[in-house]
């Protein structure tokens, strides 16, 4: 049996998809950059701190910072307390672990909780009332720490006995986060302007420690940041628009709604992405979900799926946040291994969700998650180069068919060119355009020929490390039947 036609068709489709995906990524970056620039250009139209102080409708923010072995927690807290928002409507809660207090990391000398207490003593009296510290008594990851702060007794202690959950937003920052000081004002402006949402996800960039990184680390920082702007936020922007368009279409043609809506959910809906920081969910919505999910390693991705399954759209938020990139290749691999383990954990959640409610949307989420994340993540770095070469090779089998021959050569060539152009050149230029809006000045320019050369032609460095992370999980599961993800180490350099 001659498999040449089948292999040719597979290579043709894969190369076409690769080229199309890179073009979509390019468009996604442009969409997000435009979204951010427009918002920062209109900051003067946001409600002032004084106006929010006098407006009883202004939301209250309960900002949670889960922390464990975090030597630079004071920097994150300083960023949060620099926010332009009424003091009485902002509560910052740091949740540490009792086990760390009993046995601090030797390189730190003191526990994170002690660093929080020291920071609190340096605050003026009014600010001390805004900062709370809780300690998780038993074992648990980030989700358990967050949920410890959302216990009814903790909420009553922090917010008072008569708080309204529908007017409280729960924000989440990691202990290395540096938020924009206007993030609360932006959300308040949307809420007071009648454009409110139950959940918001802001733009996060892994550039906080950019100047400390070497060339390889800077390439990875730019590439990891690009994921958030070209995929995560761009998808939320477009999803919001598309869903609203289909809703208007169904309202105008109700007879088509029973067919149109399921078809749209099955073929065109995308997964909603929560990033786990620079993220805000209204308290009553979060309580209706049973607070943060603890079934998997990555509570943020599961939360995004839970919100989507309930028909809740996450609103994209243009305010920027800086976080650290793990500073060694091994740490990047471990970070991606933890994320991939979360991807595997989400399969069981999506399967249960679909069995419980077998809708077109839930089926699409399960299938796309398995195909685009579980399967593609560990193999993409190897499959696409092989398929590209195969496409070039098999094109000559059909050289007598002019158009087929031309397109067969063109798609892998275009995909390769776009990999360098979009991944190595456009991504750098567009992220540099965000520099004026960062919460802290960061010089993102490539200054030497070596930086420019390697940044252009080694733009796949980060993806190779991410692939190693996925295979580390798969190998551990095959060998030991389990994988225990490690926390990102921010102590050693």
Spans of model-derived segments:
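Cell-envelope/extracellular polymer assembly enzymes that use nucleotide-activated donors
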Residues: 58-64, 91, 302
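Catalytic donor-sugar/metal-binding loop of nucleotide-sugar-dependent glycosyltransferases
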Residues: 295, 304-322
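Active-site-proximal specificity loops/subdomain of glycosyltransferases
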Residues: 102-167
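Long helical/loop segments within the catalytic core of UDP-sugar-dependent glycosyltransferases
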Residues: 120, 124-126, 141-159, 182-296, ...
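A conserved hydrophobic helix/loop-capping motif in glycosyltransferases and polysaccharide synthases
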Residues: 61-69, 83, 95-97
């Amino acid at each position: 049996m001659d498999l040449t036609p089948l292999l040719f068709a597979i290579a043709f489709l894969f190369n076409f998809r690769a080229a199309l995906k890179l073009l979509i990524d390019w468009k996604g970056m442009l969409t997000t950059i435009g979204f951010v620039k427009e918002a920062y250009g209109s900051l003067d139209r946001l409600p002032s701190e004084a106006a929010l102080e006098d407006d009883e409708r202004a939301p209250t923010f309960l900002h949670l910072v889960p922390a464990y072995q975090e030597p630079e927690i004071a920097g994150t807290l300083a960023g949060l307390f620099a926010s332009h928002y009424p003091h009485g409507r902002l509560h910052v809660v740091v949740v540490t672990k009792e086990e760390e207090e009993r046995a601090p990391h030797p390189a730190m000398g003191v526990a994170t909780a002690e660093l929080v207490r020291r920071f609190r003593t340096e605050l003026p009296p009014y600010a001390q009332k805004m900062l709370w510290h809780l300690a998780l008594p038993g074992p648990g990851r980030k989700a358990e720490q967050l949920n410890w702060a959302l216990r009814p007794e903790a909420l009553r202690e922090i917010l008072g006995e008569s708080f309204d959950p529908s007017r409280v937003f729960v924000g989440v920052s990691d202990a290395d986060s540096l938020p924009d000081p206007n993030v609360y004002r932006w959300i308040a402006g949307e809420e007071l302007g009648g454009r409110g949402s139950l959940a918001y996800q802001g733009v996060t960039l892994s550039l906080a420690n950019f100047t400390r990184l070497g060339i390889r680390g800077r390439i990875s920082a730019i590439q990891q940041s690009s994921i958030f702007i070209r995929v995560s936020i761009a998808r939320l922007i477009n999803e919001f628009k598309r869903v609203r368009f289909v809703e208007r279409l169904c309202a105008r043609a109700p007879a088509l709604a029973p067919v149109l809506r399921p078809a749209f959910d099955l073929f065109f809906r995308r997964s909603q992405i929560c990033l786990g920081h620079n993220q805000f969910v209204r308290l009553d919505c979060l309580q209706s979900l049973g607070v943060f999910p603890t079934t998997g390693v990555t509570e943020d991705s599961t939360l995004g799926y839970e919100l989507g399954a309930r028909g809740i759209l996450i609103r994209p938020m243009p305010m920027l946040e800086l976080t650290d990139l793990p500073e060694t290749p091994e740490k990047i691999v471990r970070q991606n291994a933890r994320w991939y383990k979360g991807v595997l954990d989400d399969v069981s959640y999506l399967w249960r969700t679909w069995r419980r409610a077998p809708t077109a949307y839930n089926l699409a989420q399960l299938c796309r998650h398995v195909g685009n994340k579980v399967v593609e993540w560990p193999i993409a770095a190897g499959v696409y180069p092989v398929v590209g070469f195969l496409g070039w090779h098999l094109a000559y089998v059909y050289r007598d068919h002019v158009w087929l021959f031309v397109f067969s050569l063109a798609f892998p060539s275009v995909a390769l060119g776009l990999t360098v152009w979009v991944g190595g050149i456009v991504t750098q230029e567009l992220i540099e355009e965000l520099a004026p809006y960062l919460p802290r000045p960061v010089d993102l320019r490539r200054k030497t020929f070596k930086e420019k050369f390697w940044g252009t032609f080694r733009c796949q460095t980060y993806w190779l490390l991410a692939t190693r992370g996925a295979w580390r999980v798969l190998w551990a599961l095959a060998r030991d039947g389990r994988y225990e993800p490690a926390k990102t180490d921010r102590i050693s350099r």
